[in-house]
Curated annotation (Swiss-Prot):
InterPro entries: LipA_acyltrans (IPR004960), Lipid_A_LpxL_LpxP (IPR011920), Lipid_A_LpxP (IPR030857). The gene is lpxP. The lineage of its organism: Bacteria, Pseudomonadati, Pseudomonadota, Gammaproteobacteria, Enterobacterales. Belongs to the LpxL/LpxM/LpxP family. LpxP subfamily. The chain crosses the membrane at residues 20-40. NCBIfam families: lipid_A_htrB (TIGR02207), PRK06860.1 (NF005340), PRK08025.1 (NF005952). Induction: Induced more than 30-fold upon cold shock. The induced activity is maximal after 2 hours of cold shock, and then gradually declines but does not disappear. Induced in persister cells. It is found in: Cell inner membrane. Pathway: Bacterial outer membrane biogenesis; lipopolysaccharide biosynthesis. Catalyzes the transfer of palmitoleate from palmitoleoyl-[acyl-carrier-protein] (ACP) to Kdo(2)-lipid IV(A) to form Kdo(2)-(palmitoleoyl)-lipid IV(A). Required for the biosynthesis of a distinct molecular species of lipid A, which is present only in cells grown at low temperatures. It may confer a selective advantage to cells growing at lower temperatures by making the outer membrane a more effective barrier to harmful chemicals. It comes from Escherichia coli (strain K12). This is Lipid A biosynthesis palmitoleoyltransferase. Disruption phenotype: Disruption does not confer any obvious growth phenotype in nutrient broth at low temperatures, but mutant shows a 10-fold increase in sensitivity to rifampicin and vancomycin at 12 degrees Celsius compared with wild type cells. It comes from the Bacteria.
Length: 306
C-alpha cells in the first residue's frame, strides 16, 4: 500500500552519478558544526537570490497580497530573511536525512506534546495538519523522534531521490503515503494512526473551495481536509516547527485538538485557512512564500501573478 524503502541496483547507473555526487557533497557538508551550517546556509540563500528572480517576484507578490498593511520596506526585509531561510532549508534537509538521532535531539525542544498524546488516547486517528515552513523536512524528523507517525507526500520524479528521501523520512517515522492515496490515508486514520499532511498549497480548481486567506478574499483551498475528516472521524491538531530567531535550534509546537470543525466544506476551508494563518505568524519569514499560493483564481478573474 505504501512506498517501500528498497535500494535498487539501477541507482548505480551513470545517469544517477550526478545525483550521487550532490548527495555526497550534502552529506559531507552537514558533518560541520551546527553554527557553521547556519552561517553557510544563510549566506548561500542570500547569494542565490539574484539567480532566482522569478521566485523573488512571486514572494514579493504574495507578501503584498497577504500583508498590505506592511510597508514596502518591511516586506523587502521579510523577503531577504525568506531567502536566507531558503538556504537553511537545504542544510536542514541534509540534517534530516543524514544526522543520527542523538545529534538531532540536541537542537530542538517541544511545546504541547501532551496535546498529541491526549488526542491519541481517544482510540481514533489523528490528522496532523502541517504548513510549508522552510524547515519542513527537519520538522518531520523531529516530530518522528517525539512520536512516530505517517505522512503524506508527493513522490519524487528521480527514483534515486525518491529512495533517499523516503529512507531519510522513515528514519524516525512509520510510513510515507502518496498524497493522492485517499484509501490509504483514510485506512491508516481508521486504524488509529497519526497522519501528517499540509493543506496550505494551491492544488488547483478540482477538489477545492475558495476561501479567505490573510487579506486575499478568494483563495483556492483544498477540500481534502474536509473529506478526510468526514470519512475517518479523526481528531485534528497542528504541528509546526520553526527555527529560533537566534539560530540556537528549533521549537516544535503541537496545538490542542481543534474544536468546532464545520460540517460545510466552504466553511471548513475558511476555518482551516484561519488555523494556517495563525501557524504561519509564528515565524512568517520562514514560510514558503516562493510558492504561487494564489495561482488558481475564480472563473473570470485574471491572474494575480504577472
Amino acid at each position: 500500500m505504501f512506498p517501500q524503502c528498497k535500494f535498487s541496483r539501477e541507482f548505480l547507473h551513470p545517469r544517477y552519478w550526478l545525483t550521487w555526487f550532490g548527495l555526497g557533497v550534502l552529506w559531507l557538508w552537514v558533518q560541520l558544526p551546527y553554527p557553521v551550517l547556519c552561517f553557510l546556509g544563510t549566506r548561500i540563500g542570500a547569494m542565490a537570490r539574484p539567480f532566482l528572480k522569478r521566485r523573488e517576484s512571486i514572494a514579493r507578490k504574495n507578501l503584498e497580497l497577504c500583508f498590505p498593511q506592511h510597508s514596502a520596506e518591511e516586506r523587502e526585509k521579510m523577503i531577504a530573511e525568506n531567502f536566507r531561510s531558503l538556504g537553511m532549508a537545504l542544510v536542514e534537509t541534509g540534517m534530516a536525512w543524514f544526522w543520527p538521532d542523538s545529534r538531532v535531539r540536541k537542537w530542538f525542544d517541544v511545546e504541547g506534546l501532551d496535546n498529541l498524546k491526549r488526542a491519541q488516547m481517544q482510540n481514533r486517528g489523528v490528522m496532523v495538519v502541517g504548513v510549508h515552513f522552510m524547515s519542513l523536512e527537519l520538522g518531520g524528523r523531529v516530530m518522528g523522534l517525539c512520536q512516530p507517525m505517517m505522512a503524506t507526500y508527493r513522490p519524487h520524479n528521480n527514483q534515486l531521490m525518491e529512495w533517499v528521501q523516503t529512507r531519510g523520512r522513515m528514519r524516525s517515522n512509520k510510513a510515507m503515503i502518496g498524497r493522492n492515496n485517499l484509501r490509504g490515508i483514510v485506512g491508516a486514520l481508521k486504524k488509529g494512526e497519526a497522519v501528517w499532511f499540509a493543506p496550505d498549497q494551491d492544488y488547483g480548481r478540482k477538489g477545492s473551495s475558495f476561501a479567505p486567506f490573510f487579506a486575499v478574499e478568494n483563495v483556492a483551498t483544498t477540500n481534502g481536509t474536509y473529506v478526510l475528516s468526514r470519512l475517518s472521524g479523526a481528531a485534528m491538531l497542528t504541528v509546526t516547527m520553526v527555527r529560533k530567531a537566534d539560530y540556537s535550534g528549533y521549537r516544535l509546537f503541537i496545538t490542542p485538538e481543534m474544536e468546532g470543525y464545520p460540517t460545510d466544506e466552504n466553511q471548513a476551508a475558511a476555518y482551516m485557512n484561519k488555523i494556517i494563518e495563525k501557524e504561519i505568524m509564528r515565524a512568517p519569514e520562514q514560510y514558503l512564500w516562493i510558492h504561487r499560493r494564489f495561482k488558481t483564481r475564480p472563473v473570470g478573474e485574471s491572474s494575480l501573478y504577472i
